[in-house]
Amino acid sequence: MSGPELGRLIDEVDRTVDVQFAAAGDLDELNRLYASLLGRRGSLNALMKQLPGAAPEERKALGQRLNAVKGRVERAREEATARIKRAARDRELSAPPLDITLPGRWRAPGRPHPIMRTLDEIVDIFVGLGFDVAEGPQIELARYNFDLLGFPADHPAMDMHDTFYMAGDPGQNVLLRTHTSPVQVREMLSHPPPVMIVAPGVVYRRDDDASHSPMFVQIEGLVVDRDVSLADLKGLLEVYSRRMFGEATRTRFRPSYFPFTEPSAELDVSCLVCFGENRACPQCKGTGWLEVLGCGMVHPTVLRNVGIDPEEYTGLAFGIGVDRTANMKFAVDDIRAFYENDVRFLGSL
């Protein structure tokens, strides 16, 4: 491009700089204008690339003119930026004042999770019956979780596919507790009879389906004293069932097996949904009964393991799945829904 032609284009840009920057109404528009002039593809940079095409004796003067225009662009940008910010501040100051006394946006108040509400209700029932509440660690030793409770070495619960063992422990001595029975063991080791406790807490098992969760809440109970009998166990759990599920609740005990109790039983209550009158009931599968808990008389071997003479003392024990109890009370099909943090679901319970 010839020197005169390049000079004419420089003058055209120079004449419009002040007008264009004065017309910019906001910072976005200002930045776009600046980029159109001095950006990588801006018009002034494009003219700078044309300098080598001018005559040698014209290049110095043309370069000085280009640099002068660039300086004007920078100054115009600074002035326009200050003007736009000043105008924005003036608009903000002239706006109606904010009334800080107006109420904010309403938020629904928080409340306990359905699982914890159920647990609190169960604990309150047993505390009202004279039980103390005991707690223990969630990371437990196999000695307390299995050995002292009379689990045989080949019991399925001790397998890797049923229990979460801690990494880096080749001896499988440290684990996430599979029940709160270790709390009972620790309590019997540290306190001589009589013992009358409930042990609520989170437990872990390798199980995940519609009726099981790998992490769930359990509460176990223990009574050790002289002359504790199966009749005491039956009467205690019948009182619990009526207070938890209603005075009209019927109960039945079925023989079962647990390594740490003998005899052992499962307690069922009459269906809370169909009351045994609907063969198609999804809650009880048409049986009219719902499994609530496992229970039994403390095995003499367990008492010996913790230093209690089974000839002098007897004990009763029971374990309640709080998640399953909540599942029954709220008629929820999939127990995993309690842990999916769907606020709409949790708020409906």
Curated annotation (Swiss-Prot):
InterPro entries in UniProt: aa-tRNA-synth_II, aa-tRNA-synth_II/BPL/LPL, Phe-tRNA-synth_IIc_asu, Phe-tRNA_ligase_II_N, Phe_tRNA_ligase_alpha1_bac, Phenylalanyl-tRNA_Synthase, tRNA-bd_arm
Cofactors: Mg(2+)
Entry GO CC: cytoplasm
E.C. no: 6.1.1.20
GO biological process annotation, one example: phenylalanyl-tRNA aminoacylation
Cofactor: how bound: Binds 2 magnesium ions per tetramer.
SUPFAM superfamilies per UniProt: Class II aaRS and biotin synthetases, tRNA-binding arm
Record's subcellular location: Cytoplasm
UniProtKB keywords: Aminoacyl-tRNA synthetase, ATP-binding, Cytoplasm, Ligase, Magnesium, Metal-binding, Nucleotide-binding, Protein biosynthesis
Domain of life: Bacteria
Subunit structure, as described in the record: Tetramer of two alpha and two beta subunits.
Protein's recorded name: Phenylalanine--tRNA ligase alpha subunit
Lineage of producing organism: Bacteria, Pseudomonadati, Myxococcota, Polyangia, Polyangiales
